[in-house]
């Protein structure tokens, strides 16, 4: 383990690129005097290393933890587990909020910590001032906070877009299970649908989101009465944008 002061950056896998941006900024701003642990960067966790042991060692040896908190990550157990592990060790933990979550929206127990918003320059000044304290420095390095925010914004805009798409897809599939093959197989571009009216109420909003984003085209053109009630008949077609841009990204997740 490095002899430098260590900053543990806690994040979920989908936010690894944001963790790397923050890691690089910390290292360059403090001229390499601070090291970072980012579990997805291929450097903090050597190939073949025991993952949990490496995490535990990094938590034990870290001087501060920055937890990347988004609407997605705060619902994952590891973010809370790692924050709790550092808190028990009396290691400072700073929740850094992004992608639609603000520090005022943090849930308990993360709300009990002093959080910061990634898109707020004053909050970033606080975070980097905390890092400077670790080194015993009286002043924080000169940092282009607006430039850092802009770097992060590129990731966040893409990330929130794909989360919106993913949520709409899963909502559609929950409303009508037969759509799973359409959205995930990559072998079907269009499918006829006959869906019970009460299910359509849940399906339509999800399809509208995807339609507005140019990812699906759908029409419902008639109804029929079956033994199970009223059904709506229609057709759902995936656009080339969905098949070429969205589907590969979903399969990587």
Say what each PLM segment does.
Residues 1-8, 15-27, 35, 100-217, ...:
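C-terminal interaction surface of TIR/SEFIR-family domains
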Residues 11-13, 70-71:
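Residue-level signal for short, function-critical loop segments
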Residues 24-56, 72-78, 128:
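Conserved BB-loop
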Residues 28-31, 84-93, 99, 105:
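Arginine/glycine-rich "motif VI" loop of SF2 helicases in the C-terminal RecA-like domain
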Residues 62:
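An anion/phosphate-binding loop that grips the pyrophosphate of nucleotide cofactors and donors
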Residues 68, 96-98, 118:
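Generic beta-sheet signal
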């Amino acid at each position: 383990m490095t002899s430098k002061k260590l900053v543990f950056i806690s994040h979920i896998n989908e936010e690894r690129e944001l963790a790397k941006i923050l890691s690089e900024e910390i290292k360059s701003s403090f001229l390499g005097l601070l090291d970072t642990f980012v579990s997805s960067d291929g450097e903090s966790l050597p190939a073949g290393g025991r993952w949990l042991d490496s995490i535990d060692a990094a938590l034990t040896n870290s001087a501060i933890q920055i937890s990347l908190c988004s609407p997605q990550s705060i619902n994952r157990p590891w973010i809370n587990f790692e924050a709790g592990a550092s808190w028990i060790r009396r290691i400072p933990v700073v929740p850094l909020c992004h992608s639609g979550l603000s520090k005022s929206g943090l849930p308990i127990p993360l709300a009990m910590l002093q959080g910061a918003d990634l898109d707020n320059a004053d909050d970033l000044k606080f975070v980097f001032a905390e890092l400077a304290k670790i080194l015993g420095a009286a002043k924080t390095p000169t940092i282009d906070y607006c430039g850092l925010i802009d770097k992060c914004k590129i990731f966040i805009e893409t990330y929130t877009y794909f989360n919106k798409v993913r949520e709409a897809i899963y909502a559609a599939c929950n409303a009508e299970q037969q759509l799973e093959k359409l959205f995930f197989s990559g072998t079907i571009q269009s499918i006829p649908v006959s869906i019970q009216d009460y299910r359509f109420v849940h399906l339509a909003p999800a399809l509208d989101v995807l339609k507005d984003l140019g990812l699906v085209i759908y029409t419902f053109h008639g109804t029929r009465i079956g033994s199970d009630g009223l059904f709506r008949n229609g057709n759902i077609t995936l656009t080339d944008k969905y098949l070429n841009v969205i589907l590969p990204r979903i399969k990587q997740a």
